[in-house]
């Protein structure tokens, strides 16, 4: 047990999200999202986007694997909602770039910078993704890139600028996004109400 635990710890990295201008959480909470349900729309829209990108790569011959079932699933747990896709997935480097750096640079710079860039492979994934923190104490991304030999990773963050990322086993490509412990729901709401 202990040896296994040690291995896990040694492959886990902690870091701070690169906050270059203002931290994006207050921006998101205040301006972008007055509507709680929007986070679910955002996460599903990210999942659909990742799926479309995989289809595109397959159609131009850049993805040669089995495309298979591309349904986006939303499943409810007691304290979680999981949005799962079998799209392009993310590598640790992409998480670092799109989640840790871009999404936390000022929202305005970010929107300015990417609004005309159709080629940003993961587009504005980060911004919509962070809307999940409006309702959850912690958010996890469990993902495996479509790239051959890619290592699956799990990223988690509790809404502070600190995150952890670790290597995990995941058989299939794609991404699960799991907002955990819904702190910000109104008293009478449960995950199911969303």
Task: Go through each PLM region and give its residues.
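Conserved small/polar residues in nucleotide/adenosyl-binding loops
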Residues: 1-7, 183-190
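GHKL (Bergerat-fold) ATPase N-terminal catalytic module, capturing the glycine-rich phosphate-binding loop
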Residues: 6-182
């Amino acid at each position: 047990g202990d040896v296994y635990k040690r291995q896990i710890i040694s492959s886990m990295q902690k870091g701070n999200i690169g906050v270059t201008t203002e931290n994006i959480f207050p921006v998101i909470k205040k301006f972008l999202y007055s509507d709680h349900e929007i986070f679910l729309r955002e996460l599903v829209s990210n999942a659909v986007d990742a799926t479309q990108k995989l289809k595109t790569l397959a159609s131009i011959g850049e993805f040669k694997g089995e495309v298979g079932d591309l349904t986006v699933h939303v499943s409810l747990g007691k304290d979680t909602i999981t949005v799962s896709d079998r799209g392009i997935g993310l590598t640790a480097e992409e998480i670092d770039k799109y989640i840790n750096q871009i999404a936390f640079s000022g929202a305005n710079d970010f929107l300015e910078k990417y609004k005309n860039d159709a080629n940003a492979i993961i587009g504005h994934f980060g911004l919509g993704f962070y809307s999940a923190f409006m309702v959850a104490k912690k958010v996890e991304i469990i993902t495996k890139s479509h790239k051959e030999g890619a290592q699956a990773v799990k990223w988690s963050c509790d809404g502070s600028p600190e995150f952890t990322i670790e290597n995990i086993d995941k058989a299939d490509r794609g991404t699960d996004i799991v907002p955990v412990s819904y702190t910000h729901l109104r008293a009478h709401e449960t995950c199911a109400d969303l």
